[in-house]
């Protein structure tokens, strides 16, 4: 018992500096934001009432949720395919998959966003090639809209969806899959009826991680959306630095943080923190 308490005390002492940093760097400033949401420009609940009546704010919230949902579905599906190859493929396939997973981390989000602008713009590589081969006569609108935002965000978030899936797949007992095959199940049926259900915790974890990250995206929607597909993080920036309407911007921030906090609590009901690494 003493050894157990000693270990717990040692762990608490090691975590104390980090917890202090989090309180000073995040919790304390956030309390200031909460205060602004109730006091600027006048004390009261006026800013939160505005969230329920301002059609612009409501449309941005809906757009953010819609884009986040689409990005989550596409990212998890793509990440699942990549993870299957990474975990259960041949050595060469694993190297290629690992390369695809790690390379995006070497490039900044700003560089990637401008790279997609170069690819998707009217005179970009994709439109130029499609016109050259005769598939289209006029350039397609692939950027400065929701499509461009979804492409850029999906490209950024796929690697983050891989790790919970990989942890879930590595924990599978191959004997269960062999038993299914031995009972006459085809490869495809074994995959959909046995393999996929057994990795459901990884799917849920990946989906929640991607969805939470999507809600707070700023740089990618600002560049690829071109001001036409404003998401909630960009709206907060505009309200605080351009309007300026600090009270409403603070209220939107508080609602976003509480919503993300609820999603994170839901996340850790389905996946252990160690599964994320």
Model feature map: region roles:
Residues 7-41, 55-170, 194-198, 202-218, ...:
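Membrane-water interface segments at the C-terminal ends of transmembrane alpha-helices
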Residues 42-53, 227-239:
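Short hydrophobic, aromatic-rich alpha-helical segments embedded in or entering the lipid bilayer
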Residues 172-176:
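Active-site loop immediately N-terminal to the catalytic Tyr-X3-Lys motif
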Residues 1-6:
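Short, Lys/Arg-rich, polar N-terminal cytosolic tail immediately upstream
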Residues 180:
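The alpha-helix within a helix-turn-helix
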Residues 183-184, 197:
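Glycine/proline-centered hinge or cleavage motifs at structural transition points of membrane proteins
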């Amino acid at each position: 018992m003493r050894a157990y308490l000693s270990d717990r005390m040692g762990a608490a002492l090691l975590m104390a500096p980090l917890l202090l940093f989090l309180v000073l760097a995040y919790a304390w400033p956030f309390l200031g934001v909460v205060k602004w949401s109730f006091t600027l420009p006048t004390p009261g609940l006026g800013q939160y009432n505005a969230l329920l009546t301002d059609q612009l704010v409501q449309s941005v919230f809906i757009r953010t949720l819609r884009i986040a949902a689409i990005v989550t579905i596409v990212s998890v599906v793509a990440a699942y395919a990549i993870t299957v190859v990474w975990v259960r493929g041949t050595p060469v396939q694993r190297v290629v998959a690992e390369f695809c997973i790690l390379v995006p981390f070497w490039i900044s989000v700003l560089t990637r966003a401008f790279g997609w602008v170069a690819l998707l713009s009217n005179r970009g590589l994709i439109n130029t090639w499609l016109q050259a081969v005769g598939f289209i006569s006029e350039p397609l609108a692939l950027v400065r809209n929701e499509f461009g935002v979804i492409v850029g965000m999906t490209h950024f978030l796929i690697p983050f969806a891989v790790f919970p899936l990989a942890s879930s797949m590595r924990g599978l007992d191959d004997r269960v899959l062999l038993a299914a095959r031995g009972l006459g199940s085809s490869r495809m049926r074994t995959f959909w009826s046995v393999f996929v259900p057994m990795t459901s915790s990884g799917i849920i974890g990946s989906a929640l991680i991607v969805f939470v990250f999507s809600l707070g995206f700023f740089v990618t929607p600002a560049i690829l959306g071109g001001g036409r597909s404003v998401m909630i993080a960009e709206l907060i920036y505009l309200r605080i630095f351009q309007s300026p309407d600090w009270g409403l911007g603070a209220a939107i921030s508080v609602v976003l943080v509480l919503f993300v906090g609820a999603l994170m609590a839901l996340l850790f009901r389905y996946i252990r923190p160690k599964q994320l690494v």
